[in-house]
């Protein structure tokens, strides 16, 4: 309604439609009362403790999944001021008090509005409150710029894009490109929303999504999707301690490339050809050159 637009969201006149979200909530969905904030921080710690009793160790937490998503599924939108307040004044101190072994990351950052995320990180207290930053969806667009300005944080990707139940080659190419982008821009981890789905990939919320493995619920047969093999190109070779030397995003040439150096001192090249014809690719490694043909 016109009233809710005024009360809940900013005026978007003159704003670029490429921004997500197009409108920002100007009020925190979480009540900004110290009683609630303190209780919520304590809840995080109790959650960690409860899982420990079941012999499940939690090593990292983030304050909110997609604080800039106004959706039908459970969520909670926050303003920059609310995010700073809760993380700096409540969650970080309580975690350090009750569970100093658990690290706190700021995430999951799902907006491509650099000014909003920059406003949060520019608070001088943030660097002592959080150890790293987690990006997903539209947030990945501003990852390079944020990392350039704030190089002292650890970085991770927090949710691969789930697709629409196609389970096809194009979905695999999309994920391959995303991994190249996030790892190439300093993320030490890449995570998935769905490892396994059945049949048409319909989620519990009623929409179709993709997964690495597809199960036929009637026969019990398993299909490893093209996306599974796209991921395998990275995870069966890139081990802990591997460093990124250089990377190239997919461009007009339809090629993406990332060069690694393994702990054993070996070069590892992972490249993708997104075009419909085979292409030649040359990678220079010092005084040596690698020439290969990437099939379509």
Which residues does each predicted region cover?
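Substrate-binding cleft and catalytic face of glycoside hydrolase catalytic domains
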Residues: 1-119, 123
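Carbohydrate-binding surface patches
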Residues: 247-286
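Conserved beta-strand positions
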Residues: 63-66, 106-107, 135, 157, ...
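Aromatic/acidic polysaccharide-binding cleft in carbohydrate-active enzymes
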Residues: 157-232, 246-249
């Amino acid at each position: 309604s016109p009233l809710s637009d005024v009360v809940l969201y900013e005026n978007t006149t003159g704003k670029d439609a490429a921004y997500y979200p197009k409108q920002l909530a100007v009020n925190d969905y979480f009540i900004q009362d110290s009683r609630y904030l303190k209780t919520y921080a304590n809840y995080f710690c109790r959650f960690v403790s409860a899982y420990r009793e079941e012999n499940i160790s939690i090593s990292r937490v983030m304050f909110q999944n997609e604080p800039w998503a106004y959706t039908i599924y459970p969520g909670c939108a926050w303003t920059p001021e609310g995010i700073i307040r809760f993380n700096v004044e409540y969650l970080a101190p309580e975690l350090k008090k009750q569970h100093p072994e658990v690290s706190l990351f700021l995430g999951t950052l799902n907006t491509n509005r650099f000014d909003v995320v920059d406003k949060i990180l520019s608070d001088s207290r943030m660097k002592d409150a959080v150890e790293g930053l987690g990006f997903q969806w539209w947030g990945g667009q501003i990852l390079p710029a944020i990392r350039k300005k704030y190089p002292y944080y650890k970085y991770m990707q927090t949710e691969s894009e789930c697709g629409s139940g196609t389970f096809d080659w194009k979905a695999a190419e999309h994920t391959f490109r995303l991994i190249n982008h996030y790892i190439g821009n300093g993320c030490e981890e890449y995570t998935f929303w769905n490892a396994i789905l059945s049949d048409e990939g319909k989620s519990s919320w009623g929409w179709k999504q993709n997964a690495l493995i597809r199960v036929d619920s009637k026969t019990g047969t398993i299909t490893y999707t093209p996306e599974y093999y796209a991921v395998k190109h990275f995870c069966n070779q890139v081990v802990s301690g591997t460093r990124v030397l250089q990377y190239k995003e997919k461009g007009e040439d339809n090629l993406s490339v990332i060069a690694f150096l393994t702990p054993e001192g070996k070069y590892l090249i992972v490249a993708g050809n997104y075009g419909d014809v085979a292409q030649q690719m040359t990678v220079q490694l010092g005084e040596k050159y690698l020439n290969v043909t990437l099939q379509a």
